[in-house]
């Protein structure tokens, strides 16, 4: 278990440090404000740019970066521009889930699944790209329909935020950009993530040492991941695998995805993935079907993923009220469409 979980934890810690320091350098603030300038006062244009930004951040820096760091930026921007904030709130949380299929680094569940892809001698991206694109397009279409009135609005273009330290800003932005090609190069993702984190820590140690604190390390999340590994391993050894194999079946990918989605919404997507991995590890397509369920299908309940819980906390801080019911009814529209559409694309 140690050989499998150690690279995952190294990546998790490194990418969190990178995202937090990039946020401190105002990379995300500037990106959001530049989007507002490029959109030239049209909300629909601004929304499409936020969609692109949320998708890119999720794919390269993981769903937590989108849900936790981009959300407060776009919510504050929405309030300043007098745009209803729920449009951007749901854009970030939904794309944090549905845009997290493409690369192994996009979601912790994908990183865990990478072990099985190596065992099966299969290329992750070769199997994931079609359902990943389908999931993003379906999400964008549903958002456009649900928030069509807000998308017709206009706003006054805001000033670009002041950057205190351009060396930190460009250094952080450069690391974020370079991580993209590094993550798809075939190198173990823990290495470029660790290198990027070390570069930024060194840069901040020289120019802004006060930003370096132990709270940058996601200690609680690391402990949670280790505890879940141990707990699910124990339950699997005592009959859980047989029960899930009966429920999910052995041949229908949509049934597997639906079972995974149900489990994610009941108990969180990480334990749902860990519990169901032995049911899906026969081939690469079943593994991606499982990931579709736990990544894209976890958007019915506020506890469906850790990223959603953190996103809700950011919404509360920004005084954007998201009740469990408002999240559920919108999720009931998106989830069946995105899960079914992604499974169809997987087999296309």
Label each PLM-derived region with a short phrase.
Residues 1-8, 121-131, 161-165, 181-194, ...:
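Interfacial loop-to-helix junctions that mark the boundaries of transmembrane helices
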Residues 33, 146-173, 207-217:
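Flexible interhelical linker loops that connect adjacent transmembrane helices
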Residues 1-83, 214-283:
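Membrane-embedded alpha-helical segments and adjacent helix-loop junctions characteristic
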Residues 41-49, 79-92, 119-130, 283-295, ...:
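Membrane-interface alpha-helices at helix entry/exit sites of multi-pass transporters
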Residues 58-68, 85-119, 140, 267-274, ...:
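Alpha-helical transmembrane segments and, especially, the helix-loop junctions at the ends
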Residues 5-17, 168-178, 187-204, 217-230:
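Hydrophobic mid-bilayer segments of alpha-helices in multi-pass membrane transport proteins
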Residues 4-16, 123-141, 286-300:
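Alpha-helical transmembrane segments
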Residues 83, 122-166, 303-348:
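Juxtamembrane and boundary regions of transmembrane helices in multi-pass small-molecule transporters
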